[in-house]
């Protein structure tokens, strides 16, 4: 194995030359297909269009869209000219959008109509009312002094905005020499992508990631699953998150394999795409795999083509991973990391025993150093002792954008990144994640780790998903609260849960509060927002007349 000094654009051009007619991007549900050479030509045309509206080296270009076909076109176009691609969570509401556009010093924002109950066009007009009266490309806003353009990704026309067809036409006026000049200045250690942390613990920060960070992390991720150019990866995770744009896209980019895209997660579209395209790998967060396995039409699709994949994004239940292996025929691997480590820090390998792949998160990525430290003393923990996971290597971010104080909080003087996650290293060098430092429940002086209780409750028949969080307690400081989603048609009482726990786990770990819910508070990338569970628990106690003691 090795690390490569190639940029995203160089990788794309490599495969466009080596395998020009091989399919690269496929949208099976709409039969839309791009070969490597076709996509590369469209990327060059888009890059020239962006140059025509003032995008150049160092310019920040935002993308606010689901996995639409031109999402990757715009990514590679920005990468080729040295611009920074800023990914925007599709679940963002007005204040979050405005915060990100201001904080990132965005120059050009690319949008679609919207998602779910959010009208992106109207929200953009609310943020930038000047669009309704200004000439396209001449936007001036006091609140957003860097913003010059809004691009609608599609054919529709909106006042004050370009659409992608117009961008491509404008590119006809840009000489190839100008594009080549900008391409020649791009270095693999330049920032290419800025992702805002998903907000599981607080307000987002802009993580600056380089070509070198993300292409090499994607490459090594694929190596762990023995990817080759013959593989077909079904990508149904959002591209605005590292899981989609790095672990999926950069894996395919560096291995020359086919990426079968799903625009927005729909378990039926995922199953149909795997069946039709004969996908060999599938990625997803736990909630996605749950939805696929429990879909009423699951048995109609042939999953035997699958051989591997990744379940990540949040703590992965062992029982769920067993079901995926048995019913979807794939050897599940896991990747642990965070946006700040681009994102993989540790990973299991396809040849690892089931216990390692499903109960642990493997060992260090090649060319990195991972250690477990005592969060209070900073000393490295012995094997088998829990501590904070820390990482140093090629995958470490450049820092948080315009936030040196926050950067200094997580990057120490030896350039180790402190994750805030708790883990244990075993004698074979494999790691197990036990929770987050901030998620730990302290009940009357006893440290309780939610992951342990969650894994236990998953074994209770009828439980589809479960999360555990601390609920404020006058007597103990915190009490254990369990939030349970039941399988369809299952009825359960609080007493059933407590009876299941009794004499099997310590009494102080048995949930004091048990809530049956339909969903968990989530980020747009599928991560559960633990910090909001506490507020939800207090709200449910109030609604149900439960006294907090």
Model-derived features with residue positions:
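Conserved AMP-binding/adenylate-forming core of the ANL superfamily
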Residues: 24-76, 93-98, 163-172, 185-186, ...
